[in-house]
């Protein structure tokens, strides 16, 4: 199936049902009082993460999603049925952003996690809500409010523990083939990898981590060169980055310049991402003599001013891969659990929330005036009358 990691959709919550004007009319109860019911709330729209999905391609063709409208109220104080909520299934790792305001509504990082993205309309009030000691036969009602409408940008960001970073043909895909069961395409030309790939590295039955391989970066990627930097977002949730450096490039470029270019593009994309733990991994050491390997590696380290961990491997020959994977596994296990790292998320403010609260507060005073039950037969006593004048 084609990998699609971005899609734009429009979600529309259901409108609230209208309240009605009604009066109780039964035999021997000629003036039974108001009994118009409230409408039902409109259905809301939710996103839910599903681990069985791995692409957003469905939403390239299915862009409009609408929840059900609330039913209108009825007589006998019958409240309208609430509109059915709509749940849109998305892959785990999806981020929802309001396209119009740029507000990030939330990230869905766990299977089954739900996120409300459009609030259903508030129900209209029936005339029963407006009765009081001075308004015994109210003819007022309110209509339901419209449901919220949002244009959403969905971005799928892969969930992985380790992210591979480097130039095209640095050997990232070969690395992931050697340490996991993933089989990404490998060839002797740049940009063989066009979409991200995931692989699971198993140290033993109980210990494993996930590696993400993204298409290679080149100088000027931030300005659109090559495949650009759109795939760097898949590294945002990684806990550690492996910067793979080809010490024997086929185009005879300087490995130090290549490594600098990658770091610069990373910082242009996101300073926060550039601050993640990053290890330097020199690949293709089997193609040079040991003295040349040490010389070239030291040249890159000096050019970068590097002080972090350094590894020398050959992904093709599977040389020195076990020590690297063991150290990565040990490092990941020392990090706090992801749930502990999560920051408090801001509550999403929906369009009609303030209106709902104000409307309910405005009518609370009427509830306090109700001394009798709504179904009391002596609600409308004989010692008063209400005159209604109709005009054409």
Curated annotation (Swiss-Prot):
One of its GO terms (cellular component) is cytoplasm. CDD domains: Obg. InterPro entries: G_OBG, GTP-bd, GTP-bd_Obg/CgtA, GTP1-OBG_CS, GTP1_OBG_dom, GTP1_OBG_dom_sf, OBG_GTPase, P-loop_NTPase. Residues 1-159 form the Obg domain. An essential GTPase which binds GTP, GDP and possibly (p)ppGpp with moderate affinity, with high nucleotide exchange rates and a fairly low GTP hydrolysis rate. Plays a role in control of the cell cycle, stress response, ribosome biogenesis and in those bacteria that undergo differentiation, in morphogenesis control. It comes from the Bacteria. Residues 129-145 have a biased composition (Polar residues). Residues 160-333 form the OBG-type G domain. PANTHER family: DEVELOPMENTALLY REGULATED GTP-BINDING PROTEIN-RELATED, MITOCHONDRIAL RIBOSOME-ASSOCIATED GTPASE 2. This is GTPase Obg. Mg(2+) binds at residues 173, 193. GO terms for biological process: ribosome biogenesis. Residues 121-146 are annotated as: Disordered. Monomer. It is found in: Cytoplasm. GTP binds at residues 166-173, 191-195, 213-216, 283-286, 314-316. Gene3D superfamilies: GTP1/OBG domain, P-loop containing nucleotide triphosphate hydrolases. Its cofactor is Mg(2+). Belongs to the TRAFAC class OBG-HflX-like GTPase superfamily. OBG GTPase family. The gene is obg. Its EC number is 3.6.5.-. Keywords: Cytoplasm, GTP-binding, Hydrolase, Magnesium, Metal-binding, Nucleotide-binding.
